[in-house]
């Protein structure tokens, strides 16, 4: 048979059927699994290189997640009808898959591994990211590549006080929590979430619920592997020569590294570490030992020294204890012409954050497989090489920048006012000007301040803190506000953002096999203390949103017109709306329900547009006074343009009090006059009067003048 190695496993999971299949598609890959959940179908493949590239001192794992438009029965929009560079969501999902599987490869494994996940069908109800993570885990487990899995994953919602397993797209929209987690049988490896100010207890409960919920998936992968797994690759054990080299590196470097890590300032510390490393490698080269292997051993020795110092003495690299947050300085309004700005400095980490307010025309149009939609809140995170004192690539954002920006986006998004209350498009740019750990959390703090400086009515400020973990057999330590070195050498990156009322975002990545609920609870409680401290420091700069938007920002006025009048405002081919825009200098957005948003740089501009639109959608009222312009004069009176594009006749008898010999004696073409609508003639034409209006003040003086004005005896009717 052609597909004699085809195997299938299915289970009921979260009210829907999860199906895992292998042996039929992509059979030349080391591992390939087709996973279906509802009508969402993905293909995950895994291929590993059989040899290590010379000089390779890291694990080259690549994860590529791709959404095909045909999966939802669509053709890509735009000029090119083919999927191109990865979208933001594809990049984020690639990272989502990468993060829980990376820690489960053996220490010292250097073979290149590539995971590719393609979305083949999307039912627009079941999100493909969870299915993709499960499929990738299954493909790795079957591949024979050394992998200490399998990994399970789930999405958790929170509606009406109840946790929901794998909520549908419609349920996610009404949920107060959107949490994705992944892990093994023993514990959790990765968490990513957006929440509406939930308590630490609720967040921990969601993680515990999710960990239990994906255990059947792990069991299904194990059962599939019992039938379909390939023979495991042999693991290369450390040779006697490598053990001797590691001992020699320890002998040459330990004391020098201890002294270097006693330096509290980052730049000076790195210079001393670099000097120790150069001396060690020079000695080893003279002894004709492997310098490339020694570099990795040097990193491991660094980790050992830092980790044990923290566990034994409770003292960190920069001299702090495990709970202390670095000194903070928050400033707002630092850039004169921007709509909102903030400079947030925490130790040697600094973010310059700028907020810009725009109109609906500035919204990001996203062409996704579900269809086109618009995004009104944009957050862009930039990490230039100078922020860490290095040279490097400058250009389009990398995966890390996209991921950090989205993390900060999730932290702020639940607090944003609705479009009906604040009809602006918001773009925030975070420029990381210095970095020594927690730059994404500095972005959260800076974004909160910059938005409030711009007048965005956030109900409460938002702050974020990054937590770390050092875990050995002899104990563990949870670290508040970690440095870059503590991130690299530690076992956990645990980021929590929120307000004084609760958590808005939580992201966790574990570099060891898993952590316990006890450690996670300690980290959450410690993070809350740190977050409240940071909020207190931020309040010294700004306690809440400014009363109004910046003078440099557009003023948006919202008016409503009847739906059947929209065509009158737009005009044939957009002729009328273009004329209004040109006349007023405003940006105007018209929605299908008759809502019109007018963005102007001054109140005068906005009023000009409002008056013109009102004139098109409303009827002038008898007895009301209007400002108009004389457009034509005749023997029998003057024609006045008023109420937008309306024209009316001021009969010669209504031009002024007393006798008027000639129309031209009172008005000329182009004069601005104040008129009162006094009725319609038998042909429906508007009749106006100037004589009953005080031309200086615009006041109605009907009761002060006679019923009829003067006129020429030969004036035409």
UniProtKB/Swiss-Prot annotation:
Q: NCBIfam families, per this entry?
A: polynuc_phos (TIGR03591), PRK11824.1 (NF008805)
Task: Give its E.C. classification number.
Answer: 2.7.7.8
Report the record's Gene Ontology biological process terms: mRNA catabolic process; RNA processing
What are the UniProt keywords, alphabetically?
Cytoplasm, Magnesium, Metal-binding, Nucleotidyltransferase, RNA-binding, Transferase
Lineage of origin: Bacteria, Pseudomonadati, Pseudomonadota, Alphaproteobacteria, Acetobacterales
For molecular function, the Gene Ontology terms on record are: 3'-5'-RNA exonuclease activity; magnesium ion binding; polyribonucleotide nucleotidyltransferase activity; RNA binding
The source organism is: Acidiphilium cryptum (strain JF-5)
Q: Write out the residues that bind Mg(2+).
A: 487, 493
Catalytic reaction(s) noted:
RNA(n+1) + phosphate = RNA(n) + a ribonucleoside 5'-diphosphate
InterPro entries the UniProt entry points to: ExoRNase_PH_dom1, ExoRNase_PH_dom2, ExoRNase_PH_dom2_sf, KH_dom, KH_dom_type_1, KH_dom_type_1_sf, NA-bd_OB-fold, PNPase
List the GO cellular component terms: cytosol
Report the protein name in the record.
Answer: Polyribonucleotide nucleotidyltransferase
Q: What class of enzyme is it?
A: transferase
Specify the KH domain's residue ranges.
554-613
Task: Give yes or no: UniProt keyword Transcription regulation.
Answer: no
The function of this protein is: Involved in mRNA degradation. Catalyzes the phosphorolysis of single-stranded polyribonucleotides processively in the 3'- to 5'-direction.
Q: Where in the cell is it found?
A: Cytoplasm
């Amino acid at each position: 048979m052609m597909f004699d190695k085809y195997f299938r496993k299915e289970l009921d999971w979260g009210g829907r059927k999860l199906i895992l299949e292998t042996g039929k598609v992509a059979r030349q890959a080391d591992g390939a699994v087709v996973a279906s959940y509802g009508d969402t179908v993905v293909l995950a493949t895994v291929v590993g290189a059989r040899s290590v590239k010379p000089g390779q001192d890291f694990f080259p794992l690549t994860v590529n997640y791709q959404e095909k438009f045909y999966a939802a029965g669509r053709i890509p929009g735009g000029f090119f009808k083919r999927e191109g560079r990865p979208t933001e969501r594809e990049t984020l999902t690639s990272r989502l898959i990468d993060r829980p599987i990376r820690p489960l490869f053996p220490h010292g494994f250097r073979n290149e591994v590539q995971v590719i996940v393609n979305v083949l069908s999307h039912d627009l109800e079941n999100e493909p990211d969870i299915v993709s993570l499960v499929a990738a885990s299954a493909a790795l487990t079957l591949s024979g590549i050394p992998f200490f899995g399998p990994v399970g994953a789930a999405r958790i919602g929170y509606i009406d006080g109840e946790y929901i397993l794998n909520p549908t797209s419609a349920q996610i929209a009404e949920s107060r929590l959107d949490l994705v987690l992944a892990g093994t049988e023993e514990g959790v490896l990765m968490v990513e979430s957006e929440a509406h100010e939930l308590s630490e207890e609720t967040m921990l409960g969601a993680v515990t619920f999710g960990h239990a919920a994906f255990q059947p998936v792990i069991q299904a992968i194990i059962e599939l592997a019992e039938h379909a797994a390939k023979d495991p690759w042999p693991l290369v054990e450390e040779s006697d020569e490598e053990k001797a080299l590691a001992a020699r590196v320890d002998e040459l470097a330990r004391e020098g590294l201890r002294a270097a890590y006693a330096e509290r300032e980052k730049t000076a510390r790195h210079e001393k570490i670099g000097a120790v490393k150069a001396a060690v490698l020079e000695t080893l080269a003279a002894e004709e030992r492997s310098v490339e292997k020694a570099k990795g051993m040097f990193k491991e020795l660094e980790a050992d020294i830092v980790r044990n110092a923290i566990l034994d003495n409770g003292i960190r690299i920069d001299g702090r204890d495990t709970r202390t947050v670095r000194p903070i300085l928050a400033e707002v309004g630092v850039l004169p012409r921007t709509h909102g700005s903030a400079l947030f400095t925490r130790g040697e980490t600094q973010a310059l954050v700028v907020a810009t307010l725009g109109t609906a025309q500035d919204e990001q149009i996203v062409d996704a497989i579900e269809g086109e939609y618009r995004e009104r809140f944009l957050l862009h995170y930039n990490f230039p090489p100078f922020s860490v004192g290095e040279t490097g690539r400058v250009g389009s954002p990398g995966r890390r920048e996209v991921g950090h920006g989205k993390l900060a986006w999730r932290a702020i998004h639940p607090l944003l006012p609705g479009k009906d209350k604040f009809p602006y498009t918001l773009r925030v740019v975070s420029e990381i000007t210095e970095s020594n750990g927690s730059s994404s959390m500095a972005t959260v703090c800076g974004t909160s301040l910059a938005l409030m400086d711009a007048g965005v009515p956030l109900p409460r400020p938002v702050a974020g803190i990054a937590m770390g973990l050092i875990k050995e057999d002899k104990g563990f330590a949870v670290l508040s506000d970690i440095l870059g070195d503590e991130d690299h050498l530690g076992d956990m990156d645990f980021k929590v953002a929120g307000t004084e009322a609760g958590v808005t975002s939580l992201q966790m990545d574990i570099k060891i096999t898993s952590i316990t609920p006890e450690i996670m609870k300690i980290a959450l409680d410690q993070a809350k203390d740190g977050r409240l401290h940071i909020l207190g420091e931020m309040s010294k700069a700004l306690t809440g949103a400014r009363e109004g938007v910046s003078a440099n920002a557009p003023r948006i006025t919202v008016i409503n017109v009847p739906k059947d009048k929209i065509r009158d405002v737009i005009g044939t081919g957009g002729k009328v709306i273009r004329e209004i825009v040109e006349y007023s200098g405003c940006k105007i957005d018209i929605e299908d329900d008759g809502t019109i948003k007018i963005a102007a740089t001054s109140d005068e501009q906005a009023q000009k547009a409002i008056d013109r639109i009102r004139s098109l959608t409303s009827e002038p009222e008898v007895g009301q006074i209007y400002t108009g312009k004389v457009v034509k004069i005749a023997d029998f009176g003057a024609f006045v343009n008023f109420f937008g594009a309306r024209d009316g006749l001021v009969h010669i008898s209504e031009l002024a009090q007393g006798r008027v010999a000639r129309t031209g004696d009172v008005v000329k073409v182009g004069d601005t006059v104040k008129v009162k609508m006094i009725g319609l003639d038998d042909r429906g034409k508007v009749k106006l009067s100037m004589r009953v209006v005080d031309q200086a003040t615009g006041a109605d003086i009907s009761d002060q003048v006679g019923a009829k004005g003067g006129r020429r005896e030969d004036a035409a009717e």
